Amino acid sequence: MLDMVNINSFTSEETPTDIIQTIFDKQAELMKKYWTKPVGEDIDTLFWSQEIRKFSKYTVEELAEAYQAMEMDWSRWEHSEEEMIDSLHFFIEKLLIANLTYKKILGYLGTDSEHVRNLIKEKAEKIKDWSIESLLRLATYHSNIADNRLRNKERKSEQLPTNRDLFYKETAEWFLKYLACFYSLWLNEDKLRELYSKKNQVNHFRIKSNY
């Protein structure tokens, strides 16, 4: 029966005032159930650098799977939606692991939440006619640029401090373009809220059920 549990097994919760902040809050609450270490402790360590890169990889992999499903068969849009929301969960988790809260993102972008939401919509409008391949390339490119600012890598013998301002600023820019890729398809703000809410409930259920 557990294998049958998915986003269609739940209903979305009521609409919050600030959808993006609510997504961050819900992800942080979920993470408390399985993270044994305090997240965002020190991104200068090799361990946390590796975790951040790992979640970037998960984010892009799920996005690629969603886009691939769309390219193969548009009738599989429900499958694509679930993969995209999985990607969003990994993405927000990566930001929180990096100690980059929504408030910090707004600070690095030098604006407020309402303006950011409008910026995302404006960017989405500019790329709405792009191919699936181009959208994925956009998301992947900015992920790699941001994570390349993490100085600690296994192949390096010397561990160096990360330029946090550069890493956070470029990750904040990735945040804008990543969500713009979602909005450029059919996942507008309301749809994103609905699907994230359902998937978040799925994940809580799976953790509670030891799935």
What residue ranges belong to the model's regions?
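Flexible "arm" and connector segments at domain edges
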Residues: 1-211
